[in-house]
Amino acid sequence: HVSALGADTESDSDYAVTKAEGETAVREAFPRAVILRPSIVFGPEDSFFNKFAALARFLPALPLIGGGHTRFQPVFVGDVARAVAIALTRQDGRTYELGGPAVYSFKELLQLILRETGRRRALIPLPFGLATIQAAFLQILPKPLLTIDQVRLLRKDNVVSPTASGLADLGITPTSVEAVVPSYLWRFHPKGEYAGAQKQARLLSQ
């Protein structure tokens, strides 16, 4: 069962609560089921790196919600897929928290996105209170850029617990953000495919 890092019935976030309730339902029905809790997942079609890279195309600045201090441990979609395949053979009733090899602050992730897309944008600190007010209006839209529940999630770090079972316990070496994200963020670079080719050439020459 694929859940999410931060699943918690006591959370202020509806998303975190529903994920925890899903885990409980699975455990009650299948006591030996394996539960996987990934941090934010990255890959060519992800909803994090692609979203902010797209926003940087037309916004003069990007918001650092809560000052940009929230920590994340992004995990590669390919590693999550491998974890699912291995979990299907185990049925040991354990919960595994899935995170990549490095932890980044929200600010550091936005800086990485801007660097890889060749964009210069101001990063403006936005207190949680103001972010909540903005989200209240934005979430009225059909495809909101921000919701109140997302702001609530950003109040808590999204990293693997040092005592939790993880990718290593499944025999998986985590893939870094830097090894994958540049291969698809070139689409958002002002120079497009040319910038992507240059990046690949530099990586191959190292």
Give the label of every model feature segment.
Residues 54-75, 79-99:
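A conserved pocket-lining segment of Rossmann-fold NAD(P)-dependent short-chain dehydrogenase/reductase
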Residues 13-20, 44-62, 107-108, 120-121, ...:
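Acceptor/aglycone-binding surface of glycosyltransferases and processive sugar-polymer synthases
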